[in-house]
Every structure is written in structure tokens, then in C-alpha cells.
Design a protein with these regions (language model features):
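Active-site loop/lid in soluble adenylation, ligation, and acyl-transfer enzymes
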Residues: 1-149, 267-274, 278-316, 320, ...
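Generic recognition of stable, solvent-exposed alpha-helical segments in well-folded globular domains
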Residues: 55, 59, 171, 175-178, ...
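Short, active-site-adjacent segments that bind or coordinate small-molecule cofactors and metal centers
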Residues: 95-97, 193-201, 206, 283-284
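A short mid-domain helix/strand-loop element embedded in enzyme catalytic domains
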Residues: 138-170
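A long amphipathic alpha-helix within ATP-dependent nucleotide-binding catalytic cores
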Residues: 168-199
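Catalytic activation segment of kinase domains across protein kinase-like and atypical kinase folds
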Residues: 199, 203-255
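Surface-exposed, gly/pro-biased binding rims or lids
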Residues: 230-289
Length: 328
């Protein structure tokens, strides 16, 4: 049986690893994408993992990949076949893509860095908004606010024209924008029915890799949704009960850790400090609650379908949300 140690690691980020499956799968067309339990704040990874976080991120991505195929193709190939046993539940076999050099942010509410930009300029990514908006207010229509992909430091917000320049194909960028807004609108409606507000989210798209012989055909290139999708790490999810315009909202994400880090006395420079057990437990509870609220099923159902074991024996159920969110 293949193990992670048998595979060639080709990329490692703050949360995910990518492994080459060329030697064990159907040629060079697939990769193994593994979501870890690592968590970062202020661009530094903490030494303390959040149990089951990687499984929540993967399970939610699968939930959305399966439900959005009619909107746009995605890179998911398998959740079990080809996945090493130790990575079950937290890994996907995915298509190899040539990723576009922009992150595709859609905002339905004015919050985070968008709120800061609006306060300063009255606009977000070059899109002028009406005067008098309050923090966390719902926008009349979702807006597409792309950003650069920064290898180091923070991504930079850009307007659509700059995104089209970076991609090098305006028509393709228009397809990306339209798909992003349609994905957001579909997910926001589903979340609303589940008592959750999808305030904003980030998508990443790619094209079939020319290395594998999939790309380069006649006509429009196939647009493929990649990376993770609509998870608490790539999105702001707020509980609808208690939503109130005029301030930051509680959220189903790492804001609980971010708030602790801000109050801990840490100077926000690496190395990041260890996270106390009660903060770990509270953060895990928020991630699991996000999965269960959005999917309508217990988190254990995802573990059973993939043959995975929970990481978090001894952790209690979901805690109530109380930390205010104001991420980027």
C-alpha cells in the first residue's frame, strides 16, 4: 500500500502539501492534496495543531465540489481511491492544473480589508460603493475583488483590469469573474437556508496542464476550480442568529486563535507561540460546527465515508461563538 513517504513532495504551504502521484497513478495528470491541522495567524504558523481541522477543510471542499459541478468544472478526482491510509479524510486526488496568478475574492458583505478600503476610499478593488455603508452590511449585489498571489506577506488587492493583465486574457478573466460570482451566490443561498451567512470567500482557478496533454486544444480553454473551496479558511461564515450591522461578527474560523494571539503579548513575528489547550478545543469546535451547520450532517459521517479516524478523542462538542471577526 502506498504511504505518504513513498510520494514525492512537490509543494508545502502553511496548511497544505502537494504530492506527485506520477509514480503510482495514471501518469502525470494527478496530484495528492493533503490538508494538515496546522494553523497560522499573522503569517506565522503556530506549533500547536488544531485536531481534525484538515479533515473539516477537506470534507467541506468535497461537499461544495460535488454541488457546483454544473457551474464550473473542478479538480477533484477521488476522496478515497489513491489516497494513502494515513491521509484518509484529509486528502484528495486532484487534477494537475496550471493555476491562474490571481485569487478570486467575492464579497457579499462589507467587512475585513474590504471595509478598511471602503472607509479610506469609498471603493473596493476599484468598485465604487454607495456612501453610508456600515461595517458588516450586506451589499446590493456581490462584488468581484481579485488580489495578487503573494509568495511572502499579504496578497495585494487589485482591480479587474489589473487581474486581466496578469492573466493575459481578458475574455478568460471575464469567465473567471462570472463563475466566481455564480459560485458565491449559489453557496450563499444554501448557507442562508442553513442559518449561516457567507460574507465573502476566495476561489482559485486553473487551466488543464499542458504537461499532461490536456491543455492546448481548439476553442476556449476549460476553466477548472482548484485548491480548497468555501471552507472556513477561505471564507467568512457568520451565524445568522445574532447578525447585527455596525461591527464585526462572530465567525466559524480561526478568529478565536487570532483574538487570543492578539491578547497574548506576542509581537506577531515568527516564531508563533504555542496555543493553550482551551483555545485549541474552542477552535476545533468552531470548525466542526461549520461543517455540521453547512452540510446538515454530523462530522462523523464524513469520517465514516472516507474510512478516517477522528484526531480529537476527548474534545467536547461545539462551543458557542463569541469572538469577533475582522480578518483580511
Amino acid at each position: 500500500m502506498t504511504t505518504l513517504a513513498d510520494l514525492r513532495l512537490i509543494a508545502s504551504g502553511k496548511v497544505r502539501e502537494l504530492y506527485d502521484l506520477e509514480s503510482v497513478a495514471d501518469g502525470p495528470s494527478t496530484l495528492l492534496m493533503v490538508a494538515s491541522d496546522r494553523i497560522s495567524t499573522y503569517d506565522a504558523v503556530h506549533p500547536t495543531p488544531i485536531p481534525d481541522k484538515g479533515k473539516v477543510l477537506t470534507g467541506l471542499s468535497v461537499f461544495w465540489f460535488e454541488r457546483t459541478r454544473e457551474i464550473v468544472a473542478n479538480h477533484m478526482v477521488s476522496t478515497v481511491d489513491g489516497v494513502p491510509e494515513e491521509a484518509l479524510g484529509r486528502a484528495l486526488v486532484v487534477r494537475r492544473l496550471e493555476m491562474l496568478p490571481v485569487e478570486c475574492v467575492v464579497r457579499g458583505y462589507i467587512t475585513g480589508s474590504g471595509w478598511k478600503d471602503y472607509q479610506a476610499t469609498g471603493a473596493v478593488s476599484g468598485i465604487a460603493l454607495r456612501a453610508g455603508l456600515r461595517e458588516s452590511e450586506r451589499l446590493p449585489e456581490p462584488i468581484f475583488t481579485p488580489s495578487t498571489k503573494a509568495d511572502v506577506g499579504h496578497d495585494e488587492a487589485i482591480d479587474f483590469e489589473r487581474a486581466a493583465e496578469l492573466v493575459g486574457d481578458r475574455k478568460l478573466m471575464e469567465r473567471v469573474r462570472d463563475a466566481s460570482i455564480e459560485l458565491y451566490s449559489f453557496a450563499a443561498e444554501h448557507a442562508r437556508e442553513r442559518g449561516v451567512i457567507l460574507a465573502d470567500t476566495k476561489f482559485e482557478f486553473g487551466l488543464p496542464s499542458t504537461e499532461t496533454g490536456e491543455g492546448g486544444g481548439e476553442g476556449e480553454p476549460e476553466l477548472v476550480l482548484g485548491d480548497e473551496v468555501l471552507t472556513p479558511d477561505s471564507s467568512r461564515y457568520w451565524p445568522a442568529d445574532g447578525y447585527e450591522v455596525g461591527h464585526g461578527q462572530p465567525s466559524f474560523d480561526k478568529q478565536f486563535v487570532r483574538d487570543w494571539a492578539s491578547a497574548s503579548g506576542w509581537d506577531k513575528r515568527p516564531p508563533a507561540p504555542a496555543i493553550p489547550q482551551e483555545v485549541v478545543a474552542g477552535t476545533r469546535a468552531r470548525y466542526v460546527e461549520a461543517y455540521e451547520r453547512i452540510t446538515g450532517e454530523p462530522f462523523e459521517a464524513w469520517l465514516e465515508r472516507t474510512g478516517a479516524a477522528a484526531d480529537a478523542a476527548g474534545f467536547g462538542g461545539a462551543a458557542g461563538l463569541g469572538a469577533s471577526a475582522d480578518a483580511g
